[in-house]
């Protein structure tokens, strides 16, 4: 038995020996997505710790709210168990060995594996609320869902009849977002046509067809970041994007960095943010 394994078992035993509190719930979140879900439905006293990226606005849509809570660092099992959790939240991209170590300690784990659409996000909110086991959490989940639905209905009302703007979401990592991605979901709701799907026929995050892309009629690049020039800069010298008119002319829509890959209900913000930039005329009557 390794020293790390012994420590994990000892911590698990200590957790098990603690006097049971009737309604005590202590939740540790291991990913940014589960941070966002947890902060939406849990009471503050139920949140034991959040992920190591919880306060990073590049990745987290709850960076400011997360400042009130501890973070688990890189979050090995020993660190997670030190927060004496009764429930640990993982995603299906969490390390399998980490999930199993926590599970073997006797702590309940909840793994989220669907986040392609807003309906998936609603289901995840309800699943977490049910795991927390109190009516207040369920009420919070339903309130969040109702708010998202109202905002989405208003967005659809404004965008009714618009001609979709032809877009792509370029990446410096050698892939581009196709169908079955959060970016495609954003496009579907924001009045955008993702050319990686309609012309490239790509699924997931796939290698871009570099030569063929040069013929795509890209109207707008969708980028993530806080500064338009900084977000565009890498693509000015990166083939094939450097040869596209949209890149040379700086035709961009800028989303908050975290919003571009958001896997929770907070993606409604991305829908609204992109729609306002692609179809500003639908908001002109509102004034400044």
Language-model region placement:
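Sec/Tat signal peptide C-region and signal peptidase I cleavage site
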Residues: 17-22
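Short helices/loops that flank or line small-molecule/ion binding pockets
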Residues: 77-84, 207-217
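His/Asp/Glu-enriched short active-site or ligand-binding loop at hydrolase and phosphoryl-transfer sites
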Residues: 182-205, 225, 253-254
């Amino acid at each position: 038995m390794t020293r790390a394994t012994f420590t994990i078992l000892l911590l698990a035993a200590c957790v098990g020996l603690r006097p049971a509190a009737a309604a005590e719930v202590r939740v540790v979140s291991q990913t940014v997505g589960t941070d966002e879900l947890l902060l939406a439905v849990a009471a503050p006293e139920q949140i034991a710790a959040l992920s190591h990226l919880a306060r990073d606005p590049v990745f987290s849509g709850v960076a400011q709210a997360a400042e009130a809570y501890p973070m688990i660092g890189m979050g090995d099992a020993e660190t997670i168990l030190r927060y004496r959790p009764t429930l640990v939240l993982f995603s299906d991209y969490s390390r399998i060995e980490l999930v199993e170590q926590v599970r073997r300690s006797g702590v309940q784990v909840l793994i989220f594996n669907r986040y392609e659409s807003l309906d998936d996000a609603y289901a995840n909110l309800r699943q977490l609320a049910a795991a927390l086991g109190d009516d207040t959490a369920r009420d919070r989940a339903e309130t969040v869902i109702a708010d998202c639905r109202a905002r989405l209905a208003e967005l659809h009302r404004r965008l009714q009849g618009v001609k979709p703007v032809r877009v792509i979401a370029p990446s410096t990592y050698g892939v581009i977002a196709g169908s079955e991605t959060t970016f495609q979901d954003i496009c579907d709701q924001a009045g955008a046509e993702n050319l990686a799907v309609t012309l490239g026929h790509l699924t997931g995050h796939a290698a871009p067809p570099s030569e063929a892309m040069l013929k795509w009629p890209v109207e707008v690049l969708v980028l993530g970041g806080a500064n338009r020039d900084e977000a565009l800069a890498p693509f000015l010298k990166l083939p094939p994007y450097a040869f596209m008119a949209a890149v040379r002319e700086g035709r961009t829509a800028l989303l908050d960095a975290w919003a571009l890959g958001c896997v929770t209900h907070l993606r409604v913000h991305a829908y609204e943010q992109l729609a306002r930039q692609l179809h500003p005329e639908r908001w002109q009557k509102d004034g400044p």
